[in-house]
């Protein structure tokens, strides 16, 4: 089962050790998923904050896939 994180700071720490990050855009929410060796972590972000969050995630993630 995926682990949903509520804190962006906590998610950034996970992204640093993630193998792959994925961005899935919906109508009301943008989901950012970070796959580590053991778990899949998700963070839900409103579309208004998407740009600032993705900017930080792109800097730390090794492999970013946009769906």
Curated annotation (Swiss-Prot):
GO biological process, one term: translation
Gene3D superfamilies xref list: 3.30.720.90
CC per GO annotation: ribonucleoprotein complex; ribosome
Entry keywords, A to Z: Ribonucleoprotein, Ribosomal protein
Alphabetized InterPro entries for the sequence: Ribosomal_eL38, Ribosomal_eL38_sf
GO molecular function: structural constituent of ribosome
Transmembrane segments: none
Keyword check for Ribonucleoprotein: yes
Family from the record: Belongs to the eukaryotic ribosomal protein eL38 family.
Protein name, UniProt field: Large ribosomal subunit protein eL38
Organism of derivation: Aeropyrum pernix (strain ATCC 700893 / DSM 11879 / JCM 9820 / NBRC 100138 / K1)
Native organism taxonomy: Archaea, Thermoproteota, Thermoprotei, Desulfurococcales, Desulfurococcaceae
Gene name tied to this protein: rpl38e
